[in-house]
């Protein structure tokens, strides 16, 4: 079942509960026999976004099986003191609002109970008798963990039936967990739609087995690995080994930004060796001129519009008096540098998707508050589902074109979620 189907199923279940008639409420929840009789009520205090509400919950007795059950409410989970709206607000503030559990609890507490920070917001001292809301960070943490468990349950066929371009990008993020533990989270993203497949937490990214887990997780979520054509990455050897062993038809596009990181020191060393016999302004001018020449030649290779132009630029670099070492370094990588320019790889990015981790770190604290890999993985799965449902910010500029302006990755993939949210998919 896809993630959108899960959300629609949850909404349908809530609508059925909310629209039950008095006769339908008398159908036993245990054996399904109709005709249960009322069996008293009990008081229940439920805190909603408007504050605590003192209610009485009806109980029923089944004549056939002899068991009792309480009336179901769609707006509050069974055996919960806070409504679904409060839980959804708290989880959304943690995932999307990019704040800590303690601050989430404080903000929700202040808003519901008109206490603490609420007095600062209204700009006056409002007298209150007692504390109306006692929401604690540990309660928010428990809600978050339950949502993470639902996110992990939804991995199977999560993105089934959702179109993919076959051009992917992948990257990993290291983290220091509590107790001096370390781990790395690997993510696979569709370069055209921005859709992120469920991430996976592994011990390291040096081996092919770790990356194989990532592709297995994506296949479990509904990705047809046979349709994957290209993968943009930073040149991790573990990924390259994995592609050679298991996915020989997939081309690895090298990230241009990481190539510049490797080429920069080489260019600097060649230039400094060449101007070693010069001093003062003469050395500075010669150094700047040589750097411009070499970087310009390298730019022509990395920014080539076609493979033929890339080969011509590589020949020009090799002909330069200082360019042979650089040309020898680039020549074995030329295919991996220019895969994105080939007609069969339209949409393949030339830069790895490292920018997604900026969003992840801002939202879930980069693992500092996670004591184990399981907790961190649940947080990453929550973030990925939220990412796929959340539309990008609407932007319009004269000099830049935003491909996903105002659209979510699911909408870019041809499956707009509409009014369905990621919280519905998590059954919160």
Regions found by a protein language model. Give the residues of each.
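Extended amphipathic alpha-helical interaction segments
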Residues: 2-8, 17, 224-232, 239-376, ...
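Short Cys/His-rich Zn2+-coordinating modules
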Residues: 3-16, 38-50
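Short, flexible, mixed-charge glycine/proline-rich loop motifs
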Residues: 14-25, 50-56
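Cys/His-enriched microdomains
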Residues: 26-29, 60
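Short, cysteine/histidine-rich loop/knuckle motifs that typically chelate Zn2+
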Residues: 29-33, 64
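Basic, short loop/linker segments at the boundary and entry of helix-turn-helix/winged-helix-like folds
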Residues: 37-95
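RNase H-like nuclease fold core
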Residues: 61, 113-232, 237, 241-249
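Basic, amphipathic alpha-helical segments enriched in Lys/Arg and hydrophobic/aromatic residues
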Residues: 362-428
């Amino acid at each position: 079942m896809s993630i959108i189907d899960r959300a629609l199923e949850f909404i349908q279940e809530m609508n059925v509960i909310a629209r039950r008639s008095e006769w339908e409420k008398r159908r036993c929840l245990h054996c399904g026999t109709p005709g249960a009789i009322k069996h008293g009520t009990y008081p229940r205090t439920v805190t909603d976004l408007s504050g605590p509400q003192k209610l009485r919950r009806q109980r029923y007795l089944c004549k056939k099986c002899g068991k009792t059950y309480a009336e179901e409410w769609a707006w509050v989970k069974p055996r919960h003191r806070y409504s679904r709206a409060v839980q959804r607000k708290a989880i959304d503030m943690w995932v999307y609002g990019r704040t800590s559990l303690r601050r989430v609890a404080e903000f929700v507490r202040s808003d519901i109970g008109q206490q603490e920070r609420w007095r600062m917001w209204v700009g006056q001292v409002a007298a209150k008798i007692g504390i109306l809301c006692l929401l604690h960070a540990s309660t928010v943490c428990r809600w978050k963990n339950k949502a993470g468990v639902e996110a992990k349950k939804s991995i199977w066929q999560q993105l089934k039936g959702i179109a993919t371009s076959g051009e992917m990008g992948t990257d990993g993020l290291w983290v220091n967990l509590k107790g001096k533990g370390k781990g790395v989270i690997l993510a696979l993203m569709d370069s055209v739609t921005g859709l992120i497949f469920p991430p996976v937490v592994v011990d390291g990214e040096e081996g092919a087995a770790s990356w194989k887990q990532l592709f297995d997780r994506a296949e479990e979520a509904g990705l047809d690995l046979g349709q994957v054509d290209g993968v943009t990455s930073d040149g991790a050897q573990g990924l390259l080994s994995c592609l050679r062993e298991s996915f020989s038809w997939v081309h690895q596009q090298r990230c241009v930004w990481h190539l510049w990181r490797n080429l920069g020191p080489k260019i600097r060393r060649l230039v400094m060796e060449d101007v070693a016999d010069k001093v003062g302004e003469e050395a500075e001018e010669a150094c700047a001129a040589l750097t411009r020449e070499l970087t310009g030649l390298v730019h022509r290779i990395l920014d080539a519009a076609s493979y033929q132009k890339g080969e011509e630029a590589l020949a020009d670099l090799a002909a330069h008096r200082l360019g042979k070492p650089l040309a020898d370094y680039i020549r074995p990588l030329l295919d991996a540098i220019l895969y994105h320019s080939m007609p069969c790889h339209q949409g393949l990015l030339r830069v790895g998707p490292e920018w997604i981790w900026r969003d992840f770190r801002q939202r879930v604290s980069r693992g500092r508050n996670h004591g184990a890999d399981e907790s961190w993985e649940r947080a990453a799965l929550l973030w990925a589902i939220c990412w796929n449902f959340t539309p990008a910010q609407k932007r319009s500029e004269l000099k830049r074109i935003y491909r996903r302006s105002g659209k979510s990755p699911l909408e870019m993939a041809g499956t707009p979620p509409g009014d369905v949210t990621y919280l519905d998919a998590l059954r919160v």
